[in-house]
């Protein structure tokens, strides 16, 4: 079983999720570690756009995190052969 968990961890590290929101791009691994944050819309860097960039960062992060959780669950089922939700 340890080998399967190790295989799962290695697989999750290699899967990169990309989420975009209003000029903000977040790349996150399927193990929910942020790889990169890119501000594609440089107009967001204006002091008057502070609230817009904060909102876009939050939404992009939440999108990336949700997708990472979804992918991690799928990989867990694939590699370990069971749905972790069934254990609850």
Feature map (PLM): residue ranges:
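A short interface-forming secondary-structure element
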Residues: 34-53
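Long amphipathic alpha-helical segments used for membrane anchoring, targeting, substrate engagement
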Residues: 1-18, 67-88
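N-terminal intrinsically disordered, cationic/polar leader segments
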Residues: 14-36
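Residue-level signal for functionally critical sites in structured catalytic/ligand-binding pockets
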Residues: 1-9, 30, 49, 55, ...
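Stable alpha-helical structural segments in soluble proteins, enriched in small hydrophobic residues
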Residues: 56, 60-71
